[in-house]
Amino acid sequence: MGCTLSAEDKAAVERSKMIDRNLREDGEKAAREVKLLLLGAGESGKSTIVKQMKIIHEAGYSEEECKQYKAVVYSNTIQSIIAIIRAMGRLKIDFGDSARADDARQLFVLAGAAEEGFMTAELAGVIKRLWKDSGVQACFNRSREYQLNDSAAYYLNDLDRIAQSNYIPTQQDVLRTRVKTTGIVETHFTFKDLHFKMFDVGGQRSERKKWIHCFEGVTAIIFCVALSDYDLVLAEDEEMNRMHESMKLFDSICNNKWFTDTSIILFLNKKDLFEEKIKKSPLTICYPEYTGSNTYEEAAAYIQCQFEDLNKRKDTKEIYTHFTCATDTKNVQFVFDAVTDVIIKNNLKDCGLF
């Protein structure tokens, strides 16, 4: 009797092969779909990372889109100088030149127009004179004692350019804008044959209850920490040190049962601001037990250890840490390339393809 397969057997073998092939294709497709959740406390740089994805992996911001940010740039600039002027009263700092008190009064009268996307020559002149004042600069140097936008100096130092009537914000200007994220912002892009869905959620305490339904099927979490927050308090709770709040949040995410199999990528962000700040503001403000030097390398490494030590599953879970400057496109491009390689490796492993 021969070993020839009957037609039914042949069909069954073909069907089996097809099922295997489909399963493999489904597995590969699943391995190519990446759901990334961006988490972190308020103002840690999450939204800036999303903007960088648009610049790096899409066509960036068109001239039309940049124009739409003009009102935000003006609003951020005005709010920054107003925050400094208000803090001067609280910190009992006088203007270097008493004539600036009139400019400060004018500022409050003229501020409304800039919120609408217009910067008059009169308003630009008022802001410029105020920003040059020695008392204003003294107050700016004490900005850890009040809430001030990170981009304050960036915009105020460039007032001549941004006050031009034909001003169109650059990609860097757009990156520097600050708008509080409310709700969830979803971004899609393709990179290294992977289809990314990135979710940016508001970091302020009031926004966190909206995270929960994003948790399912997450490939990786990018958790952003602002290194430069070590000597600041929260906007929503002036008793709470921002770095301690970040650590509390990271602890709850890193050791959450939802994320047992989720890659956790830690972005220690704003390294440029931290490098400047650590020279004059000691790390002991945040970590009284710290005995190291106030050099960037040693202080940054200490903060890294503080976060990584919160991981209660060190034997099975690795934290992938990167030092970042979210406003630096080249740095973000380099880091995201490394992050993607980790995701590819872990994804293939999960799908049994590695």
From Swiss-Prot:
Myristoylation at Gly-2 is required for membrane anchoring before palmitoylation. Palmitoylation at Cys-3 varies with membrane lipid composition. Keywords: Cell cycle, Cell division, Cell membrane, Cytoplasm, Cytoskeleton, GTP-binding, Hydrolase, Lipoprotein, Magnesium, Membrane, Metal-binding, Mitosis, Myristate, Nucleotide-binding, Nucleus, Palmitate, Transducer, Transport. One of its GO terms (cellular component) is centrosome. Its main location: nucleus. Residues 35-48 are annotated as: G1 motif. Residues 32-354 form the G-alpha domain. Mainly expressed in the brain, lung and kidney. SUPFAM superfamilies: P-loop containing nucleoside triphosphate hydrolases, Transducin (alpha subunit), insertion domain. Guanine nucleotide-binding proteins (G proteins) function as transducers downstream of G protein-coupled receptors (GPCRs) in numerous signaling cascades. The alpha chain contains the guanine nucleotide binding site and alternates between an active, GTP-bound state and an inactive, GDP-bound state. Signaling by an activated GPCR promotes GDP release and GTP binding. The alpha subunit has a low GTPase activity that converts bound GTP to GDP, thereby terminating the signal. Both GDP release and GTP hydrolysis are modulated by numerous regulatory proteins. This is Guanine nucleotide-binding protein G(i) subunit alpha-1. The gene is GNAI1.
